[in-house]
């Protein structure tokens, strides 16, 4: 799903629904890529040893492709503006235990939203004698 926000014209959003992980495990990874340039965020996800980074990288790559193909943004200027997750369904399973009892197994699902923004390069000030 691609949405272009109405307030700011240079935002691109990508949503990945039904990721098989809890929000508790996703949040630290998503907080780590916010504010970084896109290539640095992909590098960080590549070298992380968490299993869920593969799905987050897939969502980030989708957002980059949307920005490049649908909105003709330059990849070098893209920055991760927001990255957050939300709860989805929790699939419940039961495991047989001793004496006829059962233990509940929770299998949580989450959705991930990544918002990219195009950051224009600012002009560097020319250094004068007084300034």
Feature map (PLM): residue ranges:
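Short beta-turn/strand-loop junction motif enriched in small, turn-promoting residues
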Residues: 65, 99-101
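Ribosome large-subunit tunnel/peptidyl-transferase-proximal elements
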Residues: 2-85, 111-119, 123-131
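A short, conserved strand-capping beta-turn/loop at the end of a beta strand
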Residues: 85-97
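Short beta-strand/turn micro-motifs at beta-sheet edges
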Residues: 16, 101-103
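A generic structural micro-feature
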Residues: 72-74, 95-97, 104-109
